[in-house]
Amino acid sequence: FMEIYKKQTLSETFSVYFEKRMARILLLGIISGFPWVLIGSSLSLWLKEDGLSRSTIGWAGLIFAVYAFNYLWAPIIDRIRIPWLTNKIGHRRGWIVTMQIVILISLVCWSFINPTANLALVISIGLIIAIASATQDITVDALRIEQVGEDEGKSMQAGAAMAVVGWWTGYKLGGVIALNAAEFFQQAGFENYWQITFLVLGVVVIACNIGLMFVHEPQPTERQKSQIRTDQMIEEKLGASNVATKSVAWISGTVAGPIISFFKKNGFKIALGILGFVFLFKIGEAFLGRMSIIFYKEIGFSKSDIALYSKGLGWITTVVFTLLGGLFAIRSGVIKAMFVSGILMASTNLLFSVLAWSGKSEWLFAVAVIFDDMAAAFATVAFVAFISMLVDRTYTATQYALLASIGTAGRTTLAASSGAMVDWLNGDWGIFFVITAIMVIPSLICLWFIKDKLSLQ
């Protein structure tokens, strides 16, 4: 279908972004991205300003590892219904609202705690937010993919772009709200300014849930029928039909079905190649992202500077280049988009080395942030489109969660050592950013070997 897209004018290709369902996908992205503000930059800066070390903050980021394992409970989320809520607002939305309530309660708990005296409790609540966020992502991604028909490749890539725009909107604008609120309350003389900020962020969570009620949820009949057929097939192979065999069939169909389907569709070697690429692709970007706000603070930028350049300016750049990245993926193909974005990610990380070696410079900070966000936007939209096109609709939630989790595993578990790496380099931020640039190369080698054999819809 690539030839058809290339014959279209740019305005015809771009028109897909103005469909109603793209606005719904945008909101789902915002809901998914916002919790990262809470356990990312907000938590990091809260701990930093309470006097905790870079290494401690880096290791605290291990709570993000939860995102790497949400595929383990994705099959259950795909099947189990939330009492009352599922009947009222649908299966997917019922799960999202439940997890949003958990996040809201966690924010209220944070607002009563001093991190220096209760570090373990602060991190534990952060972990609860991460688990709730990772769980809602399973249904958010499934609901997003189900907004688009299975044979609509163009709309799937545009939907991926809108989801990424939404995610970064939730993350960047959420960051603008968090940083400016914290600075406002700090300057107003409140000692517990971060705790008050978390209550403000709770209002954003409530607003997102109101918006969610306008997102259409398709009837899950086909998915359920297909899952029942898989259960029956396993039950027949087990022989006698009783409670035990029905339970084994349900568990096997729930857990093994999605994995068998993935390997069957792609073949064993290609499936392993896909998993290797997904694991490695964004490791360098994660190392940079985990420590970036600490780096900005250490070279002399204030919270309002970071809010303006990294969050505000970064958000505008991300939105523009995500939409352009979506167009590039539609017109040039998702594989080419992956290669281009990988090279861009590595190149832009080097700009932070220049900033580290030259010292505090607002214009250089702005340039580094713009180009880094441009590369991250291209990379993320290509990556989301890539794994969205690999999933089987029978197991949408589970397969997407599995692929996204493997990508997150590389980024979260390994990137937790980012603070320790900076300490090991004696605070040489320049060398640290050079190392993050080199980290993308293994994933591109993986992609090169499997690119001609991929089964993309």
Predicted regions and their residues:
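Intracellular loop-helix junctions on the cytosolic face of multi-pass helical membrane proteins
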Residues: M2-E19, I105, S111-I123, T135, ...
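Helix-loop boundary and gating motifs at the non-cytosolic
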Residues: K7-Y67, L272-F277, F281-F295, I299, ...
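Transmembrane alpha-helices of Major Facilitator/SLC transporters
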Residues: V66-W73, L308-I330, S341, T348
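Helix-to-loop junctions at the C-terminal end of transmembrane segments
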Residues: N70-K88, V320-A337, V422-D423
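Transmembrane alpha-helix termini and helix-breaking/packing motifs in multi-pass membrane transporters
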Residues: D78-I80, S111, L173-N192, G326-L327, ...
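C-terminal ends and interior cores of transmembrane alpha-helices
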Residues: G94-T116, I343-K360
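Intracellular juxtamembrane helix-capping segments at the cytosolic ends
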Residues: T135-G149, F378-D392
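C-terminal transmembrane helical hairpin of 12-TM major facilitator-type secondary transporters
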Residues: K336-F383
